Regions:
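Hydrophobic, Leu/Ile/Phe/Ala-enriched alpha-helical segments that form helix-helix packing faces
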Residues: 23, 48, 186-190
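Serine-dependent carboxylesterase/thioesterase catalytic core
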Residues: 3-7, 14-17, 26-126, 138-141
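C-terminal catalytic-base region of ester-bond hydrolases, centering on the histidine
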Residues: 11, 123-195
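Structural alpha-beta junctions
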Residues: 24-27, 157-159
Length: 195
C-alpha cells in the first residue's frame, strides 16, 4: 500500500510531519495553490500515473484533489481518509474573490468553482472517510465552522463515512485520535486487498 499525503491550500507536505512520524513515510504531493486547481490536478495525475494501491491521507483542499484523483484513476486507489475537507466548497470564497479578483485560490475553492462542482458529481467508489472538525469559530462565517471551513461543507458528500472530532482545522493534523482513525481505515483497506 502506498500512502499518498496531500496537504491543504497554502501549506506544504511538512504539515503532515507528525502524522508521518506515526504512520510512516509515503508519497508527498506538494502543490502551489496559485497554479490553479486544474494545473495542479494534471501534475498530480502525472506524478501518480504508475503508482498502485494508493491510500490517500489529505487535509482540507488536499481532500478535494484526492477525490478528483480517485475518480480519474479508480483502479489505482484503495481508499482515503481526508481531514477537514470542505466537499461543499468554502462559501466565503465566492464573496472574497470579488475583493481579491487575482486570487486563483479563491476562484478554485468556492462552491460555484469548477473543482467543487465537479467534486459534487463524483460518486465515491472506494472506502472514504472525512474527519469532520467541529471546534473553532471564525468571525467571518455565520455558519458553525472549525475556524476555516463550515461543518456543513465538511459533511456535504453523503456517500462517505463522516467522523466528528472535537478539534479545529489545524489541530487535526496533530492528533493521536485522528492517527488511530487513519490506521483503522488503512488496515481495513489492507485486509480487503488481501482477500
Amino acid at each position: 500500500m502506498n500512502l499518498v499525503y496531500i496537504h491543504g491550500a497554502s501549506a506544504t507536505s511538512e504539515s503532515f510531519n507528525y502524522i508521518r512520524s506515526k504512520l510512516g513515510d509515503g508519497i508527498n504531493i506538494d502543490y502551489d495553490s496559485r497554479n490553479g486547481f486544474e494545473n495542479n490536478l494534471a501534475e498530480m495525475k502525472q506524478s501518480l500515473m504508475n503508482t498502485k494501491d494508493i491510500f490517500f491521507v489529505a487535509h482540507s483542499l488536499g481532500g478535494i484533489y484526492a477525490l478528483h484523483l480517485a475518480n480519474h484513476m479508480p483502479s489505482q486507489v484503495l481508499g482515503a481518509v481526508t481531514l477537514s475537507t470542505p466537499y461543499g466548497g468554502a462559501e466565503v470564497a465566492d464573496y472574497v474573490q470579488y475583493f481579491l479578483p487575482f486570487s486563483r485560490l479563491m476562484r478554485d475553492i468556492g462552491p460555484s468553482s469548477w473543482s467543487m462542482r465537479q467534486a459534487d458529481k463524483i460518486k465515491i467508489q472506494h472506502p472514504w472517510t472525512n474527519v469532520v472538525t467541529v471546534r473553532g469559530q471564525s468571525p467571518f462565517m455565520l455558519a458553525h465552522n472549525d475556524g476555516v471551513v463550515t461543518i456543513t461543507s465538511q459533511k456535504h458528500h453523503a456517500d462517505m463515512e463522516l467522523v466528528e472530532v472535537e478539534l479545529n482545522h489545524y489541530e487535526v493534523v496533530l492528533s493521536d485520535a485522528v492517527i488511530d482513525i487513519i490506521k483503522k481505515r488503512r488496515a481495513a483497506c489492507v485486509a480487503k486487498l488481501k482477500q
